[in-house]
Regions:
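Secretory/organelle targeting and membrane-embedding segments
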Residues: 1-170, 174-510
Length: 510
């Protein structure tokens, strides 16, 4: 096969059997001294290189205020890779990667630093063969986006020439409400065209989240049941067993709903509830997700359809932990919630009358993220009531983390002479079923940015629709005073249990 600049069989978008390899390019990280960069981004870049998915001439550039030289930054990357990378360390791979590591010292308002950055990218184009293809990763607070994007425009770094690309990657939060999300989007898209803007939601890079599409649409088994005729309700849970810790300053004023429900959980809802797209491409996937999000309706009485809480101090896992209001740097009068739950309805024929319950919180019973599709009970004409008294509702549970996989719960006869039906589970785990190791979410997403492959990245319409759902709830909560306290290690405040009890349901115990 002849490989030319126009044709490379390892980069054919329609062939998804093999991992495609990124073309000549560089990744420029702003906020390179932060935790995300050290624990996720740098190790992910190394893991991609180790798997042979980065080109030989790839370059990694850090931009920060630290008074570092290239070799200082190289040492920082080295230590991050040794500590956090998923794949085994290989000296040859590291040596090849390290040749392309550069550092630019400066602040975001320093014109000279951005000119230096431009000079370095041009030097890398010549020496490393990055060919004018550069991705800017903004791992920085949203308030800095306008300044950095304007500097990229003014310095000419954002200019795209024919046959080359420039892309920008934005980390959540995408604003704090609909108004700020629109302002943020206008700022970024005034410099970069919409198809060059990649909004990172790392949950969408997780293997199980992408498997929702395969589970639903590659199989005949589930889709006929995936509707209001058979589904009783859906529960989407994101629980953490830790507190806010060192993020107290960031977390205060944001809370559980803005932090994870607006992005992660509403994306999971959209993938669970959407119709089958006409093609497995970015535009078709996004169209269907947007249709679902635009069909979401809030119940009229938010006092009975939402719940929120703050974790108190107490004992969890054999150790004493402080309450949210006593965390270092926390305002003792804070009204920010660490637990949020809500009922949402979807106004489509498929989901008419099926409530979607979303919950997220910190200092809960265990760390778990899952989607539980709970089915209606079968008519019990055949069995006596005492024969099925131990039988719950059938459920299909998609575990996003930890132990990625799928569980199906159904009734089976208990061994013995009598007829007793009890719940059993069938369990599929990624770690057991496949010899291939799942890539870390950021590996997949960084590679997709370098390939220009956008299906896993929400566009600004999705972000705005998510805020339209959440904003009325946040406005209502602002009138409700102090959130309810809940004990650490439990599953949230009593009001969350009451939310489901009003509908005759209970939360699953993950």
């Amino acid at each position: 096969v002849d490989i030319t600049p126009e044709f490379n069989p390892l980069r054919i978008p329609s062939d998804r059997r093999l991992n495609r390899i990124a073309g000549p390019s560089s990744l420029i990280i702003f906020g390179v001294t932060g935790d995300l960069s050290r624990k996720k981004l740098m190790p992910a870049v190394y893991d991609l290189a180790n798997r042979g998915l980065l080109p030989p001439g790839f370059a990694l550039i850090g931009f920060a205020r630290r008074d570092w030289e290239d070799q200082d930054f190289e040492q920082v990357v080295y230590e991050a890779v040794k500590q956090y990378s998923r794949t085994k360390f290989d000296e040859d791979v590291w040596r090849q990667l390290a040749q392309g590591i550069r550092f630019v010292q400066g602040t975001f308002d320093d014109d000279e630093a951005f000119q230096t950055l431009k000079d370095i990218t041009e030097e890398l184009d010549r020496e490393r063969g990055t060919m004018g293809n550069h991705a800017f990763y903004l791992s920085i607070p949203p308030k800095s986006f306008p300044l950095v994007t304007e500097q990229l425009r003014r310095s000419g770094l954002a200019d795209q020439k024919e046959g080359h690309w420039r892309r920008v990657v934005i980390e959540k939060p995408f604003g704090s409400d609909l108004t700020t999300a629109r302002e943020l989007n206008a700022v970024v898209e005034s410099v970069f065209p919409p198809d060059s803007v990649f909004r990172i939601d790392h949950y969408l890079g997780k293997e199980t989240v992408q498997n929702i599409l395969a589970l639903r649409f590659a199989n005949q088994l589930y889709e006929p049941l995936w509707n209001a005729n058979y589904v009783d309700h859906v529960q989407i849970t994101m629980a953490e067993d830790i507190g806010v810790g060192g993020r107290a300053g960031y977390y205060d004023g944001i809370g559980a709903a803005r932090d994870v429900i607006q992005n992660h959980l509403l994306q999971l809802l959209a993938l669970t509830a959407m119709e089958e797209p006409v093609a497995f491409d970015a535009s078709s996937l996004r169209d269907e997700k947007e249709k679902v999000l635009s069909a979401v309706r809030l119940p009229k009485d938010l006092s009975t359809a939402t719940a929120r809480g703050q974790y108190a101090g107490g004992w969890q896992g054999g150790e004493e932990v402080v309450g949210f209001l006593d965390e270092d740097g926390m305002d003792p009068e804070s009204l920010t919630e660490t637990y949020a739950a809500m009922r949402l309805d979807i106004n489509t024929r498929r989901w008419s009358g099926v409530p979607f319950y979303l919950r997220a919180g910190k200092r809960l019973g265990r760390r778990v993220t899952e989607i539980a599709v709970v089915f209606k009970r079968a008519p019990q004409n055949l069995f006596a009531e005492d024969q099925t008294s131990a039988l719950g509702q059938n459920a299909l549970v998609i575990r996003v983390q930890p132990d990625e996989g799928v569980t199906i719960r159904f009734g089976s006869k208990v061994p013995g002479a009598g007829m007793q039906v009890r719940d059993v589970t069938m369990d599929f785990g990624y770690g057991h079923a496949f010899t291939e190791a799942s890539p870390e979410a950021y590996e997949r997403l960084i590679l997709d940015v370098l390939l220009g492959d956008p299906p896993l990245f929400p566009r600004h319409q999705e972000v705005e629709l998510s805020w339209k759902i959440l904003d009325p709830i946040e406005e209502f909560w602002r009138t409700q005073g102090q959130p309810e306290q809940y004990r650490p290690g439990t599953w949230g405040p009593a009001s969350a249990d009451e939310l489901l009890a009003r509908d005759g349901r209970t939360w699953r115990r993950p």
